[in-house]
Amino acid sequence: MSQIIEYSEKVMEHFSNPRNVGEIENPSGVGTVGNAKCGDIMRIYLDIDENQVIRDCKFKTFGCGAAVATSSMATEMIKGKTVEDALKLTNEAVQEALGGLPAVKVHCSLLAEEAVHAALWDYAEKNNLQIEGLKPPVQH
């Protein structure tokens, strides 16, 4: 017997009408993460200006509705922010912004956080930058 998962209105809105879908040509940073547990793959693209402000961000996600919704919300939350502020993005903040996630889908918000941090890591590596608090991407 399958279990019915209930999503918040905000999750359904971001799944049905995701923001920032696509790729950025010549991105400043790209982060790709995946989770073998449920098969979700997220890729976040960043366009960062000379003042370390995220001018634009896009995502491509292969996965469930919660994975798409968390990717969409995460990109909305970091667009226009500094690299330093984007680094503070947490999976809890993504969940809260979406009005919560079912317990079995919390890992999707963690993937969104990890994808953003992986893209920031890629940006730092490409530009030979040391960014306080930035850690190498998590490998699943």
Language model features with spans:
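Short beta-strand elements
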Residues: 40-50
